[in-house]
Amino acid sequence: MDIIKTLEDEQLRENKFDFHVGDTVKVDYLIKEGNKERVQVYEGTVIKMQGTGLRRTFTVRRLAYGVGVERTFLINSPRVTNVRLVREGKVRRSKLFYLRHREGKAAKVKEKQKF
């Protein structure tokens, strides 16, 4: 058995977040400022998921004052307290880097219809 794999399995977080590329999510992120702690909510579209196990990351993109901002989070980070699904997106790609070059309505992802 691989030693690194066994160590990672011990530290994996129990509550898995259920979201995919193209979904719009709200990420609750713990921020320390001096001796204070607060939770900052970051909402955007998941454009990339990468890695496996303990090193799994996802990148969220949003527009802030007309400028595209991307932020990468570790799924198993203790600073990521919660990831809430706002809406499911209908995409056929694993990486949505083409959204970086689009503006306005063209940068939106269609919503997945549930029947």
UniProtKB/Swiss-Prot annotation:
**Mind listing the GO molecular function terms for this protein?**
structural constituent of ribosome
Q: Which UniProt keywords apply?
A: Ribonucleoprotein, Ribosomal protein
Span of the signal peptide: none
Listed GO biological process terms: translation
Please provide, in alphabetical order, the Gene Ontology terms of the cellular component aspect for this entry.
cytosolic large ribosomal subunit
> What task does this protein carry out?
This protein is located at the 30S-50S ribosomal subunit interface and may play a role in the structure and function of the aminoacyl-tRNA binding site.
Q: Which family does it belong to?
A: Belongs to the bacterial ribosomal protein bL19 family.
PANTHER family linked to this entry: LARGE RIBOSOMAL SUBUNIT PROTEIN BL19M, RIBOSOMAL PROTEIN L19
Name the UniProt record assigns to this protein: Large ribosomal subunit protein bL19
Q: What is the species of this protein?
A: Finegoldia magna (strain ATCC 29328 / DSM 20472 / WAL 2508)
